[in-house]
A protein has these predicted regions:
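Core structural elements
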Residues: 186-199, 317-343, 363-383, 411-417, ...
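Extended, non-catalytic structural segments that build the interaction scaffolds
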Residues: 297-303, 310, 342, 417-429
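Structured, non-catalytic alpha/beta "coupling" segments that mediate domain-domain communication
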Residues: 113-116, 122-125, 266-290, 365-383, ...
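Strongly charged, low-complexity linkers/loops
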Residues: 387-392, 407-418, 428-501
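C-terminal non-catalytic interaction appendages of large macromolecular assemblies
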Residues: 140-145, 157, 183-190, 199-203, ...
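Basic, nucleic-acid-interacting segments
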Residues: 1-306, 317, 323, 344-364, ...
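Amphipathic alpha-helical core segments of compact helical bundles
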Residues: 16, 197, 241, 336, ...
C-alpha cells in the first residue's frame, strides 16, 4: 500500500524590538541574570494593563508583505488559555481568527508553498531543569518577547522542501533585519505537523484535508524540540517512516505531540495533541482591535529592502553569476553587500587601468565568485571562522556560506579584495602567490599590492629572462625532453614544474608553457 506524506509547518520567530510586546522591558535577555528583565506587566501582576508594541505590529505587517500575504484591515488579539509554569498570566496573548496577515506564499524550488496565516503573540518564559535535582526553575526574562508565528497550509510533501522553506524564511527575516532568527538560541523554532494518508483516498480542499468516500483519515502528529534545519529534515523523515511502518504493522496512530531526540535520532511521545477548542480562545478585553489602513501598509512597504530571491535574480542578470553562485552570494545580507561593494570597486580599478568594465564584467564576476566561494571561505573554514551551510557550486566543488556577521570579524575590505581580484585577473600574480597573499590579507588585512611587493611574489613574465631559465631546465632534463619529442606530451607539465621551482613559483605558467613548446618543437 502506498502513502502520501502531508506536512504543515508552524514557525515561531522572536522579533528584536527594543522593548517587549506589551511592556517597556528590555527585549534583549541574552546573557542576563534570570528574572532581571521583567516588570509587573510581563509578570502579570493584578491591575496591570498591556500596551501593544507598535514596531512589532509593523514588522509583522512587513513579514506579511514579504511573503505575498493579504493584510487584515481589522485585526485583534485573543487570550489563549492554558496552564504551564512558564506562562505567568495563566494565558497567552495571541491572535486567533483575525491574524495580521493571511493567505500568502513563499516559493521553494519555483513552487509556491501556501501560507495560512502570520500572527503576533507574546513568548513564554523558559523552564530550567538542574541536573540531578528533583525540581525545575523558571526564568521569565523571555516572557513577553514579541513572537511572530507563521503557519503554512498542509501542502508540503517531503522533508527537504520543509527544510528549504524554513531556511528561506530565516533568510527573509534576517534581510529585513527584524529577527536574528538563530535556532540555537531559540530565536527561531520550527514545528512540523505530519500525517500520512493512503494514495487517492484523500483530497485537499479550501485549506482542509478531507477523506474520499468512506476512507478514515489518519491523525496528524506535531513534532517539537527541533533546534536546527538539519534535524528538522531528519525528524520529519524519521516520523514519516515511523507512521508508515506503524500502519503497515496494523498499529493505530494517535493525534499527539512528539519530541525529537538528536542523540538517538528518533521521535518520542510527549503528550496528546490539543485542539483549538482546548485553549478556549476569546478576544483580549484589555486591547482594542487593530485598524490597519492602506496608508499605513504603504508606509511600511516603503521600508522593505530587496529580498534574497530578488537579489539572487538581479545578481544573475547584472553580474552574470550562475544560479548557484548567485544563490550563495545573495543568501546572506552581509555577504551580498560585500559582493556588491567588490564589484563596484572592480569597476573603478578596471576603468583606471584604461580597460572597459562592461567588456570585462562577465570574467571579473566569474573570478570574484570563484575566489569568494571556493578560496576565501576555504581559508576561513580552516581558521574556524565559517561553515554554516555547504552548497555545491560545480561538480566536485563546494562553497561554504559563512555565518552572519562574518565580515565584521575579517580584516579584508571590499576595496582590498577588489584590488586582489584585479592582480589575479591581470596576471600580475599566479595562483600559488594569490593563495599566499589571500592568507596574509585574512590574517592581517592590508593592501594586496604591498603584500605582493613585501613577499616578492610579483609574477615573472619577462620573455628573455624566462627563456634563459627554461633553457637551463631543458639542459638538465634531457631524458624528459626526449620523452616529449617521442610523443609523451604530458611530460610538459613536469618541465613546467621544474621551471616554477627554478623561479621560486613566480613564473607565469602561461608564458612558461608557450616558451617550452616553442623550444621543444623546434
Amino acid at each position: 500500500m502506498d502513502y502520501d506524506t502531508i506536512i504543515g509547518l508552524e514557525i515561531h520567530a522572536e522579533l528584536k524590538t527594543k522593548s517587549k510586546m506589551f511592556c517597556s522591558c528590555n527585549n534583549d535577555a541574552q546573557g542576563k541574570e534570570p528574572n532581571t528583565t521583567v516588570c509587573p506587566i510581563c509578570m502579570a501582576h493584578p491591575g496591570t494593563l498591556p500596551v501593544p508594541n507598535k514596531q512589532a505590529i509593523e514588522w509583522t505587517i512587513l513579514i506579511g508583505l514579504a511573503l505575498n500575504c493579504k493584510i487584515n484591515e481589522l485585526s485583534k488579539f485573543d487570550r489563549k488559555n492554558y496552564f504551564y509554569p512558564d506562562l505567568p498570566k495563566g494565558y497567552q496573548i495571541s491572535q486567533y481568527d483575525l491574524p495580521i496577515a493571511y493567505d500568502g506564499f513563499l516559493e521553494v524550488d519555483d513552487k509556491p508553498v501556501l501560507i495560512t496565516r502570520i500572527h503576533l503573540e507574546e513568548d513564554t518564559g523558559k523552564l530550567i531543569h538542574p541536573v540531578g535535582k528533583k525540581h525545575s526553575l523558571v526564568d521569565y526574562n523571555r516572557a513577553g518577547t514579541p513572537l511572530v508565528e507563521l503557519v503554512t497550509e498542509p501542502v508540503i510533501s517531503d522533508a527537504k522542501t520543509a527544510k528549504k522553506f524554513a531556511q528561506s524564511y530565516q533568510q527573509i527575516l534576517r534581510f529585513l533585519n527584524i529577527s536574528n532568527a538563530d535556532m540555537e538560541k531559540g530565536e527561531l523554532r520550527c514545528e512540523a505537523n505530519i500525517s500520512v494518508q493512503e494514495k487517492n483516498k484523500w483530497k485537499y480542499t479550501n485549506g482542509q484535508i478531507l477523506p474520499v468516500g468512506k476512507y478514515k483519515l489518519n491523525p496528524k502528529v506535531e513534532l517539537k524540540n527541533i533546534n536546527s534545519f538539519k534535524y528538522l529534515e531528519k525528524a520529519i523523515d524519521y516520523e514519516v517512516k515511523r507512521q508508515i511502518k506503524a500502519l503497515k504493522d496494523g498499529e493505530k496512530l494517535v493525534q499527539e505531540t512528539r519530541g525529537w531526540n538528536n542523540g538517538k535520532g528518533i521521535t518520542f511521545s510527549q503528550r496528546f495533541k490539543e485542539t483549538s477548542a482546548d485553549y478556549r480562545y476569546f478576544p483580549e478585553p484589555d486591547i482594542p482591535p487593530l485598524k490597519i489602513s492602506q496608508k499605513w501598509i504603504d508606509e511600511i512597504k516603503c521600508h522593505m529592502s530587496e529580498l534574497p530571491a530578488q537579489k539572487t535574480k538581479r545578481f544573475m542578470e547584472e553580474y552574470f553569476f550562475t544560479d548557484k553562485e548567485a544563490e550563495i552570494l545573495a543568501g546572506d545580507k552581509d555577504l551580498a553587500k560585500f559582493t556588491e561593494q567588490v564589484m563596484c570597486e572592480l569597476h573603478s580599478w578596471i576603468s583606471a587601468s584604461g580597460d572597459t568594465f562592461e567588456r570585462q564584467k562577465h570574467k571579473l564576476a566569474k573570478a570574484t565568485a570563484n575566489w569568494l566561494i571556493n578560496e576565501l571561505f576555504k581559508h576561513l573554514k580552516a581558521k574556524g571562522k565559517s561553515a554554516a551551510r555547504i552548497y555545491p557550486v560545480k561538480s566536485g566543488e563546494a562553497g561554504i556560506l559563512p555565518k552572519a556577521k562574518l565580515f565584521d570579524r575579517v580584516k579584508i575590505t571590499p576595496e582590498n579584495f577588489a584590488e586582489f581580484i584585479t592582480l589575479v585577473y591581470q596576471d600580475k600574480i599566479n595562483s600559488s602567490a594569490a593563495q599566499t597573499i589571500l592568507a596574509q590579507m585574512i590574517k592581517k588585512g592590508g593592501d594586496p599590492t604591498n603584500i605582493m611587493a613585501e613577499l616578492g611574489l610579483e609574477q615573472l613574465d619577462d620573455q628573455a629572462a624566462l627563456e634563459k631559465i627554461i633553457a637551463e631546465v631543458i639542459l638538465k632534463n634531457q631524458k624528459q625532453v626526449a620523452e616529449y619529442k617521442a610523443g609523451k606530451t604530458n611530460v610538459l607539465q613536469f618541465l613546467v614544474g621544474q621551471t616554477m621551482a627554478a623561479t621560486g613559483g613566480k613564473a607565469n605558467p602561461k608564458v612558461v608553457i608557450e616558451i617550452l613548446k616553442n623550444l621543444l618543437d623546434k
